[in-house]
Amino acid sequence: MDPESQCPQYGEVNQLGGVFVNGRPLPNATRMRIVELARLGIRPCDISRQLRVSHGCVSKILARYHETGSILPGAIGGSKPRVTTPKVVNYIRELKQRDPGIFAWEIRDRLLSEGICDKTNVPSVSSISRILRNKLGSLGHQHTPGTVMGSGSSSGGGSVSSNGGQNNGTSASNNINLSNLGNPGGGPHHPHHHHHHQSAAAAASAHHVHAHAHAHAHLYNSIYQPYSAAAAYSMKTPCGSPSPPQGAGGQGSVPHPHQLRSVAAAAAAAHWPSSHSVSDILAHHQAVALRASCQVGVGVGGMGGMGSTVSPLPMTPSPVAGTAGGQPLLDCEGGAGQQSPYNYYMYFQNGGMHHHHHHGGMMAAGATGL
C-alpha cells in the first residue's frame, strides 16, 4: 500500500521517502497495516522500512495498541482531561505524609495498583512531582519555633538576642543558648551569631558564665568533672584564686600538698568545663589573669608582714627548701618575675589536670605577664 495515495499531496518527506504532514495523525489504513504486520511477526524496523513510516511512529502505534487495544489516534488539539482531581491530590498527600521519602514514580504505581486511577487518567511522573512541589511543598518545611524558644527560655538571662526582643517573629530563631557551644549536637547553631557570642563572652564576668554553665551541667559530656561546692565557693571569691586559706594573726602555714591539688583541680574544673566553648575559653583566661594578679598581691603583702611561707603560685619543690624546715619555699625577692612557666605547667600536670601544651603556655604567659 502506497502511503502517498492515502495522504494529501502537501506535506513533507521523511528520511525513508514517505510523505507525512507535521502535527496530523497517520491515516487509519496505515495504522491498521502496521498492526497486521506486527501480528505476522515482522519487526518494527522492517515495518518502518516497508511502509516508509518513521520508526518512532511505528513503535508508538504498536505500544498504544498493546496497552489499550485501539489503533485510533488521540485527540487532535485541545487539552487532555484533568487528571489531578482533588481525590488524587488528597491521596498523594496521604502517601507523602505516611512516607516522606517516597518517589513520584512510586506514587504513580500506587495510584494504579490501588485503583485510584487507570491507565487513561493516571497523572504522569512530572505531574506528580509538580503537585508535590507546588501544592504539598509546605509539608516538608513545617517547623515549630517552640523548640528553639524552649531552649532559650530555660536560661535565666544567659541567652543572647540580636534584636533585643523587639521583633517577636525572629526572636525565637535569634535566641541561642551559650552553653550549647559546649555541645556540638545539643542544639541549633547559627554561624551569623558568632560575633554576638564573642562580645557577650568578653563582657560577661566569670561568675555569670560559670553559674549559667552550672545550671546546664547536663549539656556537657560525661568525661568532665562535675561541679562541687568547693568550686562554687572559689568562683564567689573576689579574685577567683584557689590559694589556700591564711592562718590567723598573719602567721603563714604550709598547707598539705593534697589540699593544694584538690582546690586547684576543683577551680580548674569550674573554669574549664568544655573544650569546645568559646565563652569558657575567654572566661578561663580572664580568671587566670585575675588569679595571678591577686596572688602576686598576696605575695607582696606576705613579705611586709610576718613572712608567709606560701608561694603565690605553686612551684616544684626545691632541694634547698626541702633540707631546711623553716626556710621559705620561694625567695620573696622578685617572686613574680622569677616564676618559671615550665614549673607552672608541670604543677598542673602533676595535679591531674590534662591540658594541652598551648593551653599551659597561654596560662603561664598570662600569669607571668602581670
UniProtKB/Swiss-Prot annotation:
Stretches with biased composition (Low complexity): 160-182
One Gene Ontology term from the biological process aspect of the record: dendrite morphogenesis
Annotated localization: Nucleus
InterPro entries according to UniProt: Homeodomain-like_sf, PAIRED_DNA-bd_dom, Paired_dom, PAX_fam, WH-like_DNA-bd_sf
Chain intervals for the UniProt region annotation (PAI subdomain): 12-68
Top-level taxonomic group: Eukaryota
Protein name: Paired box pox-meso protein
